[in-house]
């Protein structure tokens, strides 16, 4: 079985991926795992440390192939506000509850939770069910664990401690 022992962050120039693996947001924090690719092949991810993968990251297979990490469609709430200040206030309430949130310029995406929906609607938000890829913002404790510090030779070391 082929192994993956390194990766490149999304947007790294180079060869096109030969395949992909689709994972939900809570399945993308990995160190060692057997991954089932879209073509029914399997590869063993075997990294030195756990990595929080983002949509578009590339896994480097020992034979030189690249496998793209894709964010799976998930059942989410799309939250819209009356204006920007209102959106900021809604984001504050979600952050105060330590909820994973994808914060965009005009909306916020969160995993569905009927209690949170009621709270948001009570605060004047428009909440709609959607199914799409979920890429929540990384928390403050992941600030130094992003994909921006290359240590050369195509290997990337990430400290998520």
Curated annotation (Swiss-Prot):
GO CC, one annotated term: cytoplasm
Subcellular location field: Cytoplasm
Keyword field: Chaperone, Cytoplasm, Nickel, Nickel insertion
Pfam family, one: UreE_N
Claim: Chaperone is one of the keywords in the record: yes
InterPro entries: UreE (IPR012406), UreE_C_dom (IPR007864), UreE_N (IPR004029), UreE_N_sf (IPR036118)
GO biological process: protein folding; protein-containing complex assembly; urea metabolic process
Main localisation: cytoplasm
GO molecular function: nickel cation binding; unfolded protein binding
Renumbered residue ranges of the record's region Disordered: 138-161
Keyword Ion transport carried by entry: no
Primary role: Involved in urease metallocenter assembly. Binds nickel. Probably functions as a nickel donor during metallocenter assembly.
HAMAP family named in the record: UreE
Family classification: Belongs to the UreE family.
Protein name stated in the entry: Urease accessory protein UreE
